C-alpha cells in the first residue's frame, strides 16, 4: 500500500480497555451466567478472571467497537483532516489476551505537514491538552492515556542498562 499510496497520513492505535468498559464487563457477566448489575462493583481480580475466562466475548466486543470506530471515521470526513482514501489495520493480542489495533490511514486533500497549512491540520486534529472544565474526560485521560511504569518497564530498563554496560566492556576489551 505504501508503494501505491505513499506514506500514510496517520498512524492510529486503539486499545481494548476490557477491564473497565462497562458494556464489556456486562457482556462478560452474561457469558458467565451472572447478573449484569454487578458490573460496576467487580474487584480487579474478578474482572481479570472474567477476561481470561471469556476471550471470545472480548474479541467480539472489541470487533463491535472497531466497526463503530471505522463508521465514525468514514462518516466524519474531516475528523482526520480530510476524507479517508484508504486504510489498513492489524489487530494484535497482548500477553494476557487483550486485543489492540494498529492502523495506517491515508487521507486525501491533506497538505504536507511541514507547511503552515499542514501544521494547521495537525493543530485541529491532534490534541495533547486536558480540558479543565470536563472532569469526566480529565479522569479518562489521566487513567487511560498517561503512561504508568510497570514491572515490564523496569525489566526492560534493567536490560537496557546491562546492554549498555556490556557495550562499554566491549569497547574496553573487544574480545570479551
Residue map of PLM features:
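Intrinsic low-complexity, intrinsically disordered terminal tails and linker regions enriched
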Residues: 1-101, 105-176
Amino acid at each position: 500500500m505504501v508503494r501505491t499510496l505513499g506514506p500514510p497520513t496517520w498512524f492510529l492505535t486503539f486499545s481494548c480497555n476490557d477491564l473497565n468498559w462497562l458494556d464489556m464487563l456486562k457482556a462478560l457477566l452474561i457469558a458467565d451466567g451472572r447478573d449484569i448489575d454487578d458490573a460496576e462493583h467487580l474487584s480487579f481480580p474478578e474482572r481479570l478472571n472474567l477476561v481470561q475466562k471469556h476471550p471470545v466475548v472480548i474479541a467480539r466486543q472489541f470487533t463491535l467497537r472497531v466497526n463503530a470506530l471505522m463508521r465514525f471515521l468514514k462518516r466524519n470526513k474531516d475528523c482526520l483532516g480530510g476524507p479517508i482514501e484508504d486504510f489498513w489495520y492489524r489487530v494484535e493480542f497482548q500477553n494476557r489476551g487483550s486485543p489492540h489495533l494498529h492502523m495506517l490511514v491515508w487521507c486525501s486533500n491533506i497538505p504536507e505537514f511541514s507547511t503552515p497549512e499542514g501544521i494547521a491540520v495537525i493543530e485541529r486534529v491532534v490534541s495533547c491538552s486536558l480540558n479543565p472544565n470536563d472532569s469526566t474526560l480529565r479522569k479518562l485521560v489521566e487513567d487511560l492515556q498517561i503512561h504508568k511504569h510497570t514491572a515490564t518497564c523496569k525489566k526492560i530498563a534493567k536490560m537496557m542498562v546491562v546492554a549498555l554496560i556490556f557495550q562499554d566492556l566491549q569497547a574496553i576489551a573487544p574480545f570479551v
